Amino acid sequence: NNVLPILKIHGSYENPESVVLTKGKIRELLFDKPHYNEILKRYFTENTILFYGYSFNDPDIDFILQEVMADNKGHTKKHYALLPDVGKIEAQYLLEEYNVQVISYKTEEKSHLAARKFLERIVKAL
């Protein structure tokens, strides 16, 4: 079956009650509810992840990724991140720090049309 799970860590506009934007709420989910934290760690350990709409500036998620790398002594599945306008240094950092291969795309006038087209090609390939 070609159904791939989509993890919306900060919630979804389709379900407004699920949206978590404050640092306090995020930390509550990740650290006060160990089950949630363990589910995320398991996903990051056992699956190849495509990050989309995530800039790697969230310290709490970064902490989980670092835990996964430490728990597995740096040997994890390779992940991918579809990110706008990423330079070589940042891409190398993400690869070495989190085993995340960057798929960079150019934005034009703050448009992310290139990312959307890339995702559409992935969906067609499934």
How should these model regions be labeled?
Residues I6-G11:
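Active-site-proximal beta-strand elements of phosphoester/diester hydrolases
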Residues N1-V3, E14-E17, N37-L126:
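SIR2/sirtuin-family catalytic core signature
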Residues K25-E38, I64:
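Active-site glycine-rich loop that binds ribose-phosphate moieties when present
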Residues V19-G24:
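PP2C/PPM family metal-dependent serine/threonine protein phosphatase catalytic domain
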